[in-house]
Amino acid sequence: MKVMTAMYTIRRGGAYDRFIMMVEAFLERNCETHCLSLTPIPINHSYFHNHVMYLPLKTVDGLIAKLAVVLLFPLWSFWIAWRKNVDVIIAFGSLYAFLQGFSKWILKKPMVTFIRGSSYFGLKIRNSPRYFLHFNKLVEYLGLLLSDRIITNNIATRDEMLKRLGKRKNIDVQILYNNIPPMNIRKPEDIPNTRGKYGIPGDAKVLVSAGILNRGKNVEILIKCLPTIVGINLYLLVVGDGSTDADFRYEDYLKELAKKLEVDKNVIFTGWLEKEDLWKIYLASDLFILPSLSEGMPNVVLEALGCDLPCFGSDISGIRDILQYDELIFDPGDEKTVADKIQQFFTNRQFLDNVKRLCQSRKDVFAFDWKDMVFEIIMGGGAPQSH
């Protein structure tokens, strides 16, 4: 079996982790895997063939690089797919489905597309021009129409895809939830070391939130809650950073807000952490909270559950799919409800025990082999048929 996929470049974040896992799922089953990219993909395997398009540019993030991708990727993917005689095309996002759709159409090869969240929301919070938002929406729609099978990671996204496709019922749309990754870091002695590293007293309570730090993460609601929570020496760890000027301005805004509310000594920005360091912070914390305004299916919540860390999160698609219970979710715009839940968690033993029980039940749901599942969904019953 030969498959072809593409990834502009590998960055930080859960979506890129899942892309690597998807590629590994095929490599572990001895499938010849071809990947188009602008920078080398960090995979070393005899069945992995990375076709890197080297551009004479200082960065792959500029407008010229992106235009080059839109113009050249379709022809380049056709050349690779034809020359290597691939059996299946895998698009990790509707944009890649659009770019590889030419190959699928000419060569009559089936194409499976992963949809992992709303790129429209991400572009909107970065104040992208309106014409670019409309162009992105059109490209995404065409990418969906070219697909033979679509795999989403939450119920709301699946329903949205079905609505956008309208009468194109011959396109198979399925859900594959993210899983809790294998984790082996149970070292209680790390807890005082981790707390000491960030200057957190041993008797303090610790909230943690993590992810790519941008306006969509809505971290300000947690900072605003801190002054209203009484009787608790409470610290907030904000793990992660951004990658754009807008993201950096957002982090500056959060720091200024903490100073204004006089809680800056209790709000700690750690920057980006590798997985093992993040998990150590989870083990040293008391409660994980993700107050995002939009998500696909956040790995940070699943990893927190995997560390047996109780979790609260926004009542939005992706997070609700993971946490499910009303006791664990909240309106991301309701500051009072968030503060009340935090207060109850640390002062009401019955509420605390119930939250832990519910989180354990959700942890059990997501303890499965994602690589087995993704391979089975893509290839189970034979490759999808091209239409």
Where are these regions (language model features)?
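Nucleotide-sugar donor phosphate/pyrophosphate-binding loop at the beta->alpha transition
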Residues: 68-72, 110, 120-146, 159, ...
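Short His-centered aromatic/hydrophobic patch
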Residues: 91-96, 115
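Conserved acidic donor-binding segment of nucleotide-sugar-dependent glycosyltransferases
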Residues: 325-335, 344-349
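A short, active-site helix/loop in glycosyltransferases that binds the activated sugar's phosphate group
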Residues: 145-172, 180-184
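Aromatic "clamp/platform" in nucleotide-sugar-dependent glycosyltransferases that forms part
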Residues: 293
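Short alpha-helical donor nucleotide-sugar binding micro-motif in glycosyltransferases
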Residues: 272-273, 280-285
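Short hydrophobic beta-strand element within catalytic cores of glycosyltransferases
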Residues: 310-313
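Conserved donor-binding/catalytic core segment of Leloir-type glycosyltransferases
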Residues: 4, 201-217, 223-226, 237
